[in-house]
Amino acid sequence: MAKRSMIEREKKRIKLHQKYESKRQALLEEYNSTSDFNLKLEIHSKIQRLPRNSSKIRIRNRCWKTGRPRGYYRDFGVSRHVLREMAHQCLLPGVTKSSW
């Protein structure tokens, strides 16, 4: 189980990303469409003034049940440990144990 503070920090990052997503996207589109160097520097400084945690890159995928950041399966939203437990309990439709 992940520390409670890490899970809360991740939730805070998600909220910040949702809050500043449209503003950041508009600035990036303006930055990419402009060819004037001085204007690009000005836009870049505006982007840098946004909160660091409002960037999507800073968000880490975590298991919804345990908060584990590693061994995360995107399709299910859980870590490998929880995936195995849920598959054995037949809680994931269509998932079967492989044998060959």
From Swiss-Prot:
Subcellular location: Plastid, Chloroplast
InterPro entries: Ribosomal_uS14, Ribosomal_uS14_bac/plastid, Ribosomal_uS14_CS
Keywords of this entry: Chloroplast, Plastid, Ribonucleoprotein, Ribosomal protein, RNA-binding, rRNA-binding
GO MF terms held by the record: rRNA binding; structural constituent of ribosome
One of the record's GO cellular component terms: chloroplast
Pfam families: Ribosomal_S14
Domain of life: Eukaryota
Any one GO BP annotation for this protein: translation
Keyword rRNA-binding: yes
Chief location: plastid
Quaternary data: Part of the 30S ribosomal subunit.
Similarity-based family: Belongs to the universal ribosomal protein uS14 family.
Function (record text): Binds 16S rRNA, required for the assembly of 30S particles.
Protein name per Swiss-Prot or TrEMBL: Small ribosomal subunit protein uS14c
Organism for this UniProt entry: Thalassiosira pseudonana (Marine diatom)
Gene from which this protein is expressed: rps14
